[in-house]
From Swiss-Prot:
Full protein name: UDP-N-acetylmuramate--L-alanine ligase
Organism of provenance: Gluconobacter oxydans (strain 621H)
GO annotation terms (biological process): cell division; cell wall organization; peptidoglycan biosynthetic process; regulation of cell shape
Family: Belongs to the MurCDEF family.
Transmembrane portions of the chain: none
Residues involved in ATP binding: G115, T116, H117, G118, K119, T120, T121
Gene name linked to the record: murC
Length: 477
């Protein structure tokens, strides 16, 4: 198979610390390519790459290019970035992240997982099952897989599992043999323009698979189900809770540690059905059962046995920032979650209920003014499973403020729609005091967002302990 030549020269990543960029850089490095990069700040991904032997500069400067022969950028990197400007002045190719990922995918048979929500967890689940099947996959994910401690895995097998990013349409470049679509909600309309254009993009993503490949679609989601007749010339496997699904979950039992369920497997070509399982998934929420069904569908089509699938799911350790418990104080559980879309937020809060929370306290840091504006009504109605909602300032992610799409507007919108307990967060420094005043043993504090709120969630258990630590008795030895 023709592939990216090893003598291509130094590959320089602008914004190498990003979750998507770091994974590609790490795999290229492990394959023997000379990789370097830069980022605006230190971080866990930067530290990990340095430990792997990759040179990372902090700050963007034309001098960082050195002897680079290729420059890789993401959509977060502006055209006037000094390193990009210098590369173009030197006639060095500037490559988009997805294009470099596509080159890596040409080295293997690839599974690409797309969708508005659940991509990272589903990618991790597929990788886990393939690993248990001894297929030794290479993995490039959009989140940290707890079992690996990183978002990548370098395997020697024939398969690669990747998370497909739809935010800028770049997933249309990916040469997948198996394409998964978990769901399709309005998101990233700043790129797509309209929902119709976004749907057409997903159609193309799946249509790109070769005739010997197949698509795995969540039939529970109406927009995804509507794709099926448009893909009549492709092999399509559906999954979900729907009686119409080829891979259908039944007898789902939720407890405080996860879910147990059986699966009805229907082969429409042979008009046969059989029952598989039970399967045990140590993750909360019906949305994660759906994610596991996608992995089961992929695995069964690859002729992986039920027992191997069951073993993989049972041992699955999850993904960082997906209902991750950062600690506990006085019976109060602190949870960190990446959820920043209304559908994700509603699913996470429901999972907290299923975990047995006495009360659920949601701490929300909205991510991007544009998202809050476009989905304002949805944000105002997705918090019903939270007894109390604490709303922080919007994490701008480089955007300028938009009137009517800020913290106070969201607080008012939630109250107007009937939520009985919504309060603004004056400043992150006040969070521990606010939680200390309202949380009781058995409560769950769920921190939601894609910005800096993860740092608050990590610090909160120790901050609560410090607030309640009794001062030393005067005169004590």
């Amino acid at each position: 198979m023709r592939a990216l030549p090893l003598n291509i020269g130094t590959i320089h990543f602008v914004g190498i610390g990003g979750i998507g960029m770091s994974g590609i850089a790490e795999v290229l490095h492990m394959l023997g390519y000379k990789v370097q990069g830069s980022d605006i700040a230190e971080g866990a991904n930067v530290q990990r790459l340095r430990q792997a032997g990759i040179v990372v500069h902090i700050g963007h400067d034309a001098a960082n290019l050195g002897d680079a022969q290729v420059v890789v950028t993401s959509t977060a990197v502006k055209k006037d970035n000094p390193e990009v400007v210098a590369a173009r002045a030197k006639l060095i190719p500037v490559v988009r992240r997805a294009e470099m990922l596509a080159e890596l995918m040409r080295l293997r048979w690839s599974v690409a997982i797309g969708g508005t929500h659940g991509k990272t967890t589903t990618t991790s689940l597929v990788a886990c099952v393939l690993e248990h099947a001894r297929l030794d996959p290479t993995v490039i994910n959009g989140g940290i897989i707890e079992a690996y401690g990183t978002n990548t895995r370098m395997g020697s097998g024939d398969w690669m599992v990747v998370e497909a990013d739809e935010s800028d349409g770049s997933f249309l470049r990916l040469p997948a043999v198996i394409a998964v679509v978990t769901n399709m909600d309005p998101e990233h309309l700043d790129h797509w323009g309209t929902e119709e254009a976004m749907q057409a993009g997903y159609d193309q993503f799946v249509s790109n698979i070769p005739f010997y490949g197949f698509a795995v679609l969540c039939v529970d989601h109406p927009q995804v189900q509507q794709m099926i007749p448009r893909l009549s010339d492709h092999r399509v496997i559906t999954y979900g809770f729907s009686p119409q699904a080829d891979i259908r979950a039944e007898k789902v039992v939720m407890d405080k540690r996860g879910a147990t369920f059986e699966v009805v497997v229907t082969n429409r070509q042979r008009n046969r059905s059989r029952r598989a399982g039970p399967f045990r998934l140590p993750m909360l929420g019906h949305h994660n059962v759906l994610n596991s069904l996608a992995a089961i569908a992929v695995a069964l089509e690859m002729e992986i046995s039920d027992s191997v699938i069951a073993s993989a799911l049972t041992t699955f350790k999850g993904v960082k920032r997906r209902f991750t418990r950062t600690g506990e104080y006085n019976g109060i559980s602190i949870v960190d979650d990446y959820g920043h879309h209304p559908v994700e937020i509603a699913a996470v809060l429901k999972a907290a209920r299923q975990a047995g929370a006495r009360n659920v306290i949601a701490v929300m840091q909205p991510h991007r003014y544009s998202r809050l504006k476009v989905l304002f009504n949805e944000f105002c109605t997705c918090m019903n499973d939270a007894d109390t909602v604490i709303v922080a300032d919007v994490y701008a992610a480089g955007e300028t403020p938009i009137e009517g799409a800020g913290r106070d507007a969201l607080v008012e919108g939630l109250r107007d729609r009937g939520h009985r307990s919504v309060v603004p967060l004056p400043d992150p420094a006040h969070l521990a005091e606010m939680i200390n005043a309202i949380a009781k043993p058995g409560d769950y504090v769920v921190c939601l967002g894609a910005g800096t709120i993860t740092q608050w969630a990590q610090a909160l258990p120790a901050q609560l302990e410090a607030l309640n630590r009794q001062p030393a008795t005067e005169g004590a030895a």
